């Protein structure tokens, strides 16, 4: 059963030294991201616990993604939680949604019971703010089958540089990451609501593909001082 760690292993074999993930302070190649994910997978495997759903809570987007990928390699079904999820809320979410394990810096047993659909390789949490997030499952094919057409329509290819801002627990950002991985492209990730710093990152990295939710895109458009000649695609979508 194919998953995104399998895809990363393939891309890292083809493009080991190509820059994959970028933040203000980090530049990681495909090989480096793969190595970090394999290290996390080895840590999970050393625990010798039954496989199941795993709620992952990290503040840093690179750490979110390497744990997400490593969990898949280790045979778990990863679920990225919001970075501000407190231990108490994580445990409540685990109990209400039947998530088997929690790793928010401390790995611990959660609440078993959630039935994982056949073929599911990850869980995603709904972004509704009125209640506890719902847990939805995704197969690899549910996204990956659309990547060839998405990449064609939006011009996402190996030399593309995409930009997102915010947590990878948001489905929109995670989907962009997955598309970038499929294309063998690069992903620049802004951290925090600092549009002037996003502007610096876009110029510095020569971003070609911009993805922001509408409210953040409007905020960004208010502060930009120069045209971005490198940007060919702008996407405004939901998180």
Give the residues covered by each predicted segment.
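A short N-terminal helical cap/helix-turn-helix that marks the beginning
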Residues: 1-19, 118-121
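Conserved AMP-binding/adenylate-forming core of the ANL superfamily
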Residues: 9, 17-48, 90-91, 104, ...
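Conserved AMP-binding/adenylate-forming
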Residues: 26, 42-84, 165-167
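Conserved AMP-binding A3 loop
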Residues: 29-30, 120-148
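ATP-dependent adenylate-forming carboxylate-activation enzymes
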Residues: 58-59, 79-93, 185-205, 214-216
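Flexible, low-complexity linker/hinge segments
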Residues: 102-120, 137, 145-147, 153
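Conserved AMP-binding/adenylation subdomain of ANL enzymes
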Residues: 144-161, 169-209
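Adenylate-forming
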Residues: 193, 207-239
């Amino acid at each position: 059963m194919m998953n995104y760690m399998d895809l990363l292993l393939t891309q890292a074999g083809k493009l080991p030294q190509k820059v994959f993930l970028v933040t203000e302070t980090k530049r990681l190649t495909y090989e480096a991201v793969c190595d970090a994910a394999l290290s996390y997978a080895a840590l999970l495997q050393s625990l010798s616990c039954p496989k199941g759903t795993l709620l992952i809570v990290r503040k840093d987007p690179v750490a979110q993604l390497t744990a997400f990928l490593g969990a898949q390699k280790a045979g778990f079904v990863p679920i990225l939680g919001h970075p501000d999820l407190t231990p108490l809320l994580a445990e409540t979410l685990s109990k209400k949604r039947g998530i088997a394990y929690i790793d928010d810096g401390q790995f611990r047993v959660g609440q078993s019971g959630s039935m994982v659909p056949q073929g599911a390789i990850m869980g995603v949490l709904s972004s509704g703010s009125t209640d506890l997030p719902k847990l939805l499952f995704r197969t690899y094919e549910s996204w990956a089958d659309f990547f060839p057409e998405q990449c064609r329509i939006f011009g996402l290819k190996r030399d593309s540089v995409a930009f997102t801002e915010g947590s990878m627990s948001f489905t929109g950002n995670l989907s962009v990451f997955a598309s970038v991985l499929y294309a063998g492209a690069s992903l620049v990730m802004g951290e925090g609501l600092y549009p002037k710093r996003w502007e610096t990152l876009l110029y510095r990295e020569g971003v070609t593909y911009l993805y922001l939710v509408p409210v953040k895109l409007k905020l960004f458009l208010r502060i930009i001082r120069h045209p971005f000649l490198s940007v060919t695609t702008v996407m405004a979508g939901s998180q």
